Amino acid sequence: MQQAPSGYSYPMATTVLPAHAVANLMGNDVAAVLTATDIVMGQLTAELRGARAGDVVDLVASNGAVLQFTIAKVVPDEISGGTELLLSIEAAERLGVTRESRMVLWGFDSRASLDAELIRQNLISTSIRVRRSWDPPDPDATLGMAQTKAALGEFAYRVNTNGSVSIDSTWKNANISAGSIGQLSLRSGCHNLVRAALTNAMNEVIASGLEYTINYFHANTAGGCYVPRFNRLTPNSSIGFLSRHTWGQAVDTNTVGSCQGCAPPDMDCRTVRIFRKHGFAWGGNFLTPDGMHFEWVGKRRDVGLYPSRYCGNTNAGSLAALDGESERSTIFADDGLYVGDH
């Protein structure tokens, strides 16, 4: 049994879809087991905690009530789209989740015609995220929650009355270390794996004569790495999104010229590609540009051409060969995390 400390919960990425959408996207066998009390769990998430079909999961509703659900089926992540928990509309309503935040399209005859209609309806913009299962691998795609937990560990957290977030001390003490990396002070700390990659990236930036492109003053005053934060879905709700900074997974540097929303960001593209080389996605190509943000993904990302808005890769090797996953297998992986958070 996995039990969070009293007053704490484990963050779980959750996707809610109607039965007919699940049937078309994941198969009738998956749709058939979803009920108001039965849910589906992704395979990676199940492996991380030794869960299996028939186990019971306690989920915290928007009003704070704890409700029980049964794992009816464990499915491969390439089937579930990378989410941790898949719920029916009826199960979500029990939890107080009713806001619609996604439209899923399938069964169309022509991809080109679909894209043309999206453009005609003014749906291709920086305010609407459009993902296609056939898109090429994006070098600035981030890790889903299950992948993040597998790489950086899973913690229990508590949202305090003032909106701040407390993380269980066992995980924090084992994974978060403070101390500078060169002129980056990182006073609040950073995940140990991220620190190692950040050290290598900064060493190459300096060796390439590009240290001047990093604004240390901004990084050390308004930036940071380990900064636990929670974005509530609605006021006073226990349901919301954790920032990736809660894992000590990302670092912010040039917070003025490459601020969230600044377009184009002023970050030097040579520095961006060095960070990608050492396993960081860059926020400059998020839906809302966040050019100050470098987020650890643990895999080289400077390989493979992609139509990035800013700072595209110049190395034409195959990113797909490095990542070994498709857009289809990660289409719901960002659920539960605040995408584009700085």
Predicted features by range, described:
Residues 202-249, 281:
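Active-site-adjacent loop/helix surface patches within enzyme catalytic domains
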Residues 238-342:
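Catalytic cores and adjacent binding grooves of peptidoglycan-active enzymes
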Residues 151-215:
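Active-site acidic/histidine clusters and adjacent loop/turn architecture
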Residues 32-36, 81, 180-192, 239-240, ...:
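Second-shell loop/turn segments in exported
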Residues 1-137:
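Basic-flanked hydrophobic alpha-helices used for secretion and membrane insertion
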Residues 18, 88, 190, 194-201, ...:
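Stable alpha-helical elements in mature extracytoplasmic
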Residues 134-163, 319-322, 331-332, 338:
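N-terminal low-complexity, Pro/Thr/Ser-rich intrinsically disordered segments
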Residues 47, 55, 196-199, 203, ...:
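Solvent-exposed, polar/charged alpha-helical surfaces in well-ordered, non-transmembrane soluble domains
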